[in-house]
């Protein structure tokens, strides 16, 4: 069976890479592609935009058609668009892979409610290496976390609009769970002024924005006399695209539920 993958926001950087990754993956093909109404590239061949040649799939201006024509849709866009696409997925009964970040707690709850009716993959990062970092960092935290200060440092390109990154928050959540802390209660997002001594229960987040950095994430475990650092550096967005396509191929076989890359990689 060949899976028909739909891609929203297909003219953006991630959208084009998702088309390329879908075209190169075994067992799937590009089934539909869309952009926001009025986009200048509506009507163009999505394959040509992605540099893989004509695929016969034209960029549409109606996302509803994408969800109707595809077996599964991958959405890397912005929060407002993703929530609108989620409603289309519900209406069509189409599984969806969400790569958008920056959701509020209430918006994440909307995604969880949708997953009661359709299969949803919602992950902060689709790179296999990053998800291994989550797993390894949690294991390290379980051993060291009670005695070590924990800090997370992330860096991204100048155009990223949310901070800390969804990946940094996912890393923090994995670590917090391992040391039996509530991340909402112990997270410190940057420091300035007379902050006082560090509370050993906190997990600090530092954000760097600049240049064309695809994504760097480091978990630091520090105590007197030593420091352990675990780092993942992404050099190409293609690693995210490949992971998302892998997730799309997996989720079409699943029953309704909320999944992440740990399910796909067998970490749970």
UniProtKB/Swiss-Prot annotation:
Position of the signal peptide: none
Pathway named in the protein's UniProt entry: Amino-acid biosynthesis; L-lysine biosynthesis via DAP pathway; (S)-tetrahydrodipicolinate from L-aspartate: step 4/4
Gene Ontology biological process terms, A to Z: diaminopimelate biosynthetic process; lysine biosynthetic process via diaminopimelate
Catalytic activity: (S)-2,3,4,5-tetrahydrodipicolinate + NAD(+) + H2O = (2S,4S)-4-hydroxy-2,3,4,5-tetrahydrodipicolinate + NADH + H(+); (S)-2,3,4,5-tetrahydrodipicolinate + NADP(+) + H2O = (2S,4S)-4-hydroxy-2,3,4,5-tetrahydrodipicolinate + NADPH + H(+)
GO-annotated cellular components: cytosol
Positions of NAD(+) binding: 9-14, 35, 99-101, 123-126
Enzyme Commission no: 1.17.1.8
InterPro entries named in the record: DapB_C (IPR022663), DapB_N (IPR000846), DapB_N_CS (IPR022664), DHDPR_bac (IPR023940), NAD(P)-bd_dom_sf (IPR036291)
Location of this chain's protein in the cell: Cytoplasm
Pfam families xref list: DapB_C, DapB_N
Protein name from the UniProt record: 4-hydroxy-tetrahydrodipicolinate reductase
Source organism of the structure: Magnetococcus marinus (strain ATCC BAA-1437 / JCM 17883 / MC-1)
Gene: dapB
